[in-house]
Amino acid sequence: MSSQRPPRPLDDVRVLELGAFLAGPFCGQLLADFGAEVIKVEPPGKGDPMREWGRHRYKGRTLWWPVLARNKKSITIDLRTPEGQALVKRLVPHVDMVLENFRPGTLEEWGLGWEELHALNPGLIMIRVSGFGQTGPYRDKAGFGSIGEAMGGIRAITGFPDRPPTRIGISIGDSLAATFAALGALVALHQRQRSGQGQVVDIGIYEGVLALMESMIPEYQLTGHIRERTGNILPNVAPSNIYPTADGSWFVIGANADTIFTRLAQAMGQPELATDPRFATHQARGEHQAELDDLIAAWTLNYTADQLQVMMDEYGVPAGRIYTAKEMLSDPHFIARQSIIGVHDPDLGEIKMQNVVPRLSATPGGVDWTGPALGQHNREIFTDLLGLTEDDLAMLQAKRVI
């Protein structure tokens, strides 16, 4: 922990991150945000592929890595070599958690499976994120986030009914699995305080998606209903949609409760809508959803998004324009709550990124540094933690183990 910052709740937790891409490393980011010392293991010479992922470059660097690897320490180990595997085994007694997202069985092939590592550290918590989990007939299949999204149910219900299933604009499957993995890690850590024993946290990417599918399963089981794509509406819940504006943007209005709809009707200058039999109750509005949406859209087209926001705020109607990064960086509420912060990067200068979520009143998380250079912390970890000598490091480097 840096002596120049306040303490964080996970300052006494050390994590060895063996994963790559997103599903494992985002879990590591969440833990590091709250103070965990996350030691990220990367292949020598090339590092995590996420170092090269991203839509745009600035000063020759992609911009995903500085966010995903923030607060982490980078060391290099070739896990495919006996010497590299031996280094991991030497590190395991010094850590609380091992985080990995290889295909099931890979670490076992390298002699780094649960049985081997647990024997070295009985209190170890091993966080295992994979496409389909560590058990079951699909455990050995390759499974990226897109496959988990498809099989977990979210692709089938995303988009419009007359078009093919649509991808959400972010890697939601990987991120959900990572978030649940972080939750599982903290639950296991709490249990270890009681028992002194570690355990495996096992999540398949598809399960992280499935967990958010609301009542989709019992709806089919008990009624035979299969949810379909519905575009931007909530079926039978109205009004809740996006509406066009006079300045060519889109505006979200959610006024599906009776009292809120009454206020919306007043804001529209059409208070009679609240007593119209077609719209007077939640059920009636649901039955006349398209008709109601058309009425609201015809009204919103007369105003800019800013004008609509003023009116909706005045009448207490939940509403807002659809933001891009441009609006987020200038919004006074984002600024007041420091939802986006600036972090110094030695190569990029100040880089803006999302702040730590959630907020803790007494021991909040924070961001101390952006994603590190490849192997930046080799000497710190290998010499200070493991006691290797300069000769040891030179030999391992010569063999390309680190």
Swiss-Prot record:
* The protein's enzyme class: transferase
Against Pfam families, the record matches this protein to: CoA_transf_3
Q: What is its EC number?
A: 2.8.3.20
This enzyme catalyses: (3R)-citramalate + succinyl-CoA = (3R)-citramalyl-CoA + succinate; (R)-malate + succinyl-CoA = (R)-malyl-CoA + succinate
Q: Where is the active site?
A: 174 (nucleophile)
What keyword terms does UniProt attach to this protein? Transferase
Query: Would you say which domain of life the source belongs to?
Result: Bacteria
User: What induces or represses its expression, per the UniProt entry?
Assistant: Under autotrophic growth conditions.
- Keyword Transferase in the entry? The reply is yes
**GO BP field:** carbon fixation by 3-hydroxypropionate cycle
Q: Name one GO molecular function term.
A: CoA-transferase activity
Positions of transmembrane segments: none
For this protein, the record's SUPFAM superfamilies field holds: CoA-transferase family III (CaiB/BaiF)
Keyword Transferase carried by entry: yes
Q: Which InterPro entries match?
A: CoA-transferase_III, CoA-Trfase_fam_III, CoA-Trfase_III_dom3_sf, CoA-Trfase_III_dom_1_sf
So what family is this one in? Belongs to the CoA-transferase III family.
Q: Fill in the subunit field for this protein.
A: Homodimer.
Q: What does this protein do?
A: Involved in the 3-hydroxypropionate cycle used for autotrophic carbon dioxide fixation, and in the glyoxylate assimilation cycle used to regenerate acetyl-CoA and produce pyruvate as universal precursor for biosynthesis. Catalyzes the transfer of CoA moiety from succinyl-CoA to D-citramalate to yield citramalyl-CoA.
| Protein name from the UniProt record | Succinyl-CoA--D-citramalate CoA-transferase
Species annotation: Chloroflexus aurantiacus (strain ATCC 29366 / DSM 635 / J-10-fl)
